[in-house]
Swiss-Prot record:
This is Histone H2B. The modification Phosphoserine is found at S12. GO terms for cellular component: nucleosome; nucleus. It is found in: Nucleus; Chromosome. Pfam families: Histone (PF00125).
Length: 137
């Protein structure tokens, strides 16, 4: 005897057991298909190396750079980035704002970098923002 209409469940695309949220796996580890051996995947290290190299080639096309020098420059860029971001965050908090705008970045650059260097940095930053704004319209 066929089941009554009230006893039937509506058809679903996925089985009931698959409705659970998928389990999170470790990002740095992958298990091999055979045996208990575990294969680790390399974690990506994000650096400014490619950008530093491009700028170097624009300024001095025939000059190279060692890995050690590239590492030092990368650390330098990370340090300056962190200082500017921290200062901009403080400025936004002082003004009771939850968003860091170009104004906070500009002010933090003026506070962190000395004299002429700050003027050039602000000038180049303004130029970059203007170029970006005109290209997105």
């Amino acid at each position: 005897m066929p089941p009554k209409a009230a006893d039937k469940k509506p058809a679903s695309k996925a089985p009931a057991t698959a409705s659970k949220a998928p389990e999170k796996k470790d990002a740095g580890k992958k298990t091999a298909a055979s045996g208990d051996k575990k294969k680790r995947t390399k974690t990506r290290k994000e650096t400014y190396s490619s950008y530093i190299y491009k700028v170097l080639k624009q300024v001095h096309p025939d000059t190279g750079i060692s890995n050690r020098a590239m590492s030092i420059l990368n650390s330098f860029v990370n340090d300056i980035f962190e200082r500017v971001a921290t200062e901009a965050s403080k400025l936004a908090a002082y003004n009771k704002k939850s968003t860091i705008s170009s104004r906070e970045i500009q002010t933090s650059v003026r506070l962190i970098l000395p004299g002429e260097l700050a003027k050039h940095a602000v000038s180049e930053g303004t130029k970059a923002v203007t170029k970006y704004s005109s290209s997105t319209k």
